[in-house]
Regions:
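Juxtamembrane/interface motifs at transmembrane-helix termini
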Residues: 46, 142-146, 182-187, 228-234
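An N-terminal domain-start capping segment
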Residues: 69-76, 140-145, 205
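Short linear motifs at protein or domain termini
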Residues: 1-104, 111, 230-234, 244-253
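Short amphipathic alpha-helical segments at helix-loop
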Residues: 26, 86-91, 134, 178-182, ...
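Short helix-capping and inter-helix turn/linker motifs at the boundaries of alpha-helical repeat units
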Residues: 4, 187-188
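C-terminal effector-binding regulatory domain of bacterial HTH transcription factors
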Residues: 207-253
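Conserved amphipathic alpha-helical segments that form helical-bundle/coiled-coil interaction surfaces
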Residues: 98-179, 190-199, 208-223
């Protein structure tokens, strides 16, 4: 119960910061005011503030109170920060930064995966791909399998730092996939592109793997641009992952 109260308070305050209710550079209201507004104790408020400091959203100091830091200092690899931004609305700048990060990290990662992936690594990536295909053919959660696919590639590098990055990138990648696959037939059209990446890794061809992942990322970027061009407001991801409906017999491999 105490943990739920703490997590709920962190969530309310974090989202209030990210949505701009407490703008960058502003000072949070005094503890008594926050206690009254949220219906929690001072101890809960203080612990929540500590959590938000750890996430890079706040700083405290003598005579300045608790102040909201600039967005550049927020921990964008923190799943909570990404979730708050996703609920608030995904700006073009946020999505641009995310796609640029993918283009920097994933091509180099799949080159290493093509050189180092074990039989077990490949089996796990194959299983993720099978989950993607099944969700298209019979309906289901495509995005979770898509995330497993990409995180499997990162783990297959057998680089400890990249493996840690795969955990941190999880929320960011899921955000990208939720937007890019929201177009009609988006998942079905991206499935062969994923297959090309997997085949190149199986064939131990770093160059082909790199080219294939770049095509995949650029295709996702085009899908995101299409989604943004048809939105009257910034897309948000406050709901559970979209479930695909079953389709007619799939032609994708």
């Amino acid at each position: 119960m105490i943990r739920n109260v703490h997590a709920g308070t962190v969530d309310v305050l974090g989202e209030a910061i990210v949505t701009g209710r407490y703008p960058v550079g502003s000072t949070l209201p005094p503890e008594p005011m926050l206690c009254g507004e949220l219906g929690v104790s001072r101890t809960v408020i203080r612990e929540a503030v500590k959590s938000l400091i750890a996430k890079g959203l706040l700083i405290t100091g003598p005579k300045v109170g608790t102040r909201v830091l600039a967005e550049e200092q927020w921990n964008w690899f923190d799943p909570d920060v990404v979730a708050w931004q996703s609920r608030a609305g995904l700006s073009r700048d946020f999505l641009r930064d995310l796609q640029e990060l993918r283009r920097v990290v994933e091509p180099a990662a799949v080159r290493l995966a093509a050189e180092r992936a074990t039989a077990q690594d490949i089996a796990e990536i194959e299983a993720a791909y099978a989950g993607m295909k099944l969700s298209i053919d019979e309906g289901g959660d495509y995005v979770s399998s898509d995330l497993r696919f990409h995180q499997g590639l990162l783990r297959a590098c057998h680089n400890r730092m990249v493996a840690q990055m795969s955990k941190a990138l999880g929320a960011l990648l899921r955000t990208s996939f939720e937007i890019s696959t929201s177009r009609p037939h988006g998942p079905a059209s991206s499935l062969p592109l994923h297959r090309a990446v997997l085949d190149a890794v199986i064939a131990r061809s770093p160059q082909k793997a790199e080219r294939a992942i770049i095509v995949l990322i650029d295709g996702a970027n085009d899908d995101i641009e299409q989604v943004l061009s048809t939105c009257r407001k910034l897309p948000s991801l406050g709901q559970p992952a979209r479930q695909l409906k079953a389709r007619a017999k799939a032609s994708a491999r």
